[in-house]
Amino acid sequence: MNAPATPLEQCILDEGLEDLIPLPEIVQTVEMRGLSESPSIVSEVAAVIGALVRDGRIQIWAGPWPAEPEFVAGPLAESLVEDLGQYQFNSPSDLRRRVYYVNVDNLHVDERA
């Protein structure tokens, strides 16, 4: 059973119920909702995304823009969400490979398949 979500975690999970969410978009959403006033908002969001990936509550998808993203698992998924450049549109990291997340209650890929 998962612990109750913080407002930041809940925002990330709720947004992920809608569609594949680009990492830069969730940072903008968190800022607009005033869920973090930290100057290190990107680091804060990245830490929560990483924890949710490790907990199996969200999954990561990635691919070059504008191609359809593909499911990414394991160490690659974790390394992508730890790259703070992925949280800004048109950064070098984002231009190489745009990273998305989705709430597993919306879309779940069996990692063993």
Question: Where are each of the predicted segments found?
Answer:
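Short amphipathic alpha-helical interface segments
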Residues: 1-43, 47, 54, 62, ...
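Short, amphipathic alpha-helical interaction segments positioned at domain boundaries
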Residues: 67-113
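Short alpha-helical interface elements
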Residues: 33, 37-38, 51, 70-78
